[in-house]
A protein has these predicted regions:
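Residues in the short beta-alpha loop(s) of Rossmann-like NAD(P)-binding domains
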Residues: 20, 40, 97, 177-178, ...
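Rossmann-fold NAD(P)-binding glycine/threonine-rich loop
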Residues: 95-112, 235-279
């Protein structure tokens, strides 16, 4: 029988599926009593259903597809969402793909994609920028101050990364397709050019940070890089770098995915927790918590 089931059954219990340190820290940011479970080596369906039957809020990873790494959990969730039993769940997660969105909509299950929240995206970008600095210092042989650094893309993360690097004394050049993005980058004090000038700008740069989830760091640009240059690619898979060209020319590429789940993970968890509390009725009333948080390692 579940821990605390009789006492807390109708109070909106929470399930957090833990795939990284950020998810692990998330429980401490939410009101409730924490009970830890470990399903990494498999889970009995009866136990899983008992947890799910007693929960209102399911917090999936960022991105949501990380749940698919655990076959048992992924299968049970899919089965329950598409089954005949009506589920009064609210799902939280980041980057719900078309399949997950369709599954929730077909089941009439409410879901909230935290990575569509402007506040979450901005705070996440700030953390990502700091983490990117850590990655540069870890993999580059050069200090940031005085270094020419190329930032590929000028979206939320690109803007924040360029701002932080510039504040640290880097000579930042932004690559952006949009004329408006280039204009904005220049108003912030950066050099800014179209991607067609990438090869020319690559000469003399020792670090390239890519934020674009499309193939933009191509062979002509990689060919011009110095042998000790490094590419920090933070874009979602498959990234934006021609890996074969990088291997051919001996250029180091670091696939720096999910940085908020690796760095400053308590701050990163607080960002998600604030969004969950903002879009739910989870609250701690009185001196004693009335909610159980099932923190499940998968």
């Amino acid at each position: 029988m579940l821990y605390g089931r009789e006492r807390f059954y109708m109070t909106g219990n929470i399930v957090i599926f833990v795939t990284d340190q950020r998810q692990s820290n998330l429980a401490a940011c939410l009101p409730g009593k924490i009970h830890r479970l470990d399903w990494r080596r498999g889970v009995e369906k009866e136990e899983a259903l008992e947890v799910l039957d007693n929960s209102k809020y399911l917090v999936l990873p960022v991105p949501v597809t990380k749940i698919e790494r655990n076959h048992d959990v992924n299968f049970i969730l899919k089965e329950e969402l598409t089954g005949k039993k009506e589920r009064d769940w609210i799902l939280f997660g980041g980057v719900f793909g078309p399949e997950w969105r369709q599954r929730c909509e077909d089941a009439g299950t409410e879901y909230y994609d935290m990575m569509t929240d402007a506040v979450v995206v901005h705070r996440n970008a700030c953390i990502t920028a700091e983490a990117t600095v850590a990655e540069i210092l870890k993999y580059s042989d050069y200090s940031i101050r005085g270094q020419k650094i190329i930032v590929s893309g000028y979206g939320r993360c690109g803007k924040e990364i360029a701002r932080v690097l510039s504040a640290m004394g880097a000579k930042v050049t932004v690559l952006a397709r949009s004329a408006e993005a280039r204009r904005l980058a220049r108003t912030e004090g950066h050099e800014a050019v179209d991607f067609s000038y990438g090869p020319e700008e690559a000469y003399g740069a020792r670090t390239v940070v890519n934020t674009v989830p499309a193939l933009v760091i191509r062979e002509p640009m990689i060919r011009e890089m110095h042998s000790d240059a490094v590419i920090i690619d933070i874009a979602s898979r498959p990234g934006g770098t021609d890996l074969m060209a990088a291997e051919t020319y001996g250029i180091k590429v670091v696939a720096a995915l999910g940085l908020p789940g690796l760095y400053t993970t308590k701050s990163s968890a607080k960002v998600l927790a604030d969004a969950i509390l903002e879009h739910s009725k989870i609250r701690q009333d009185g001196k004693e918590a009335k909610t159980w948080i099932y923190q499940i390692a998968i």
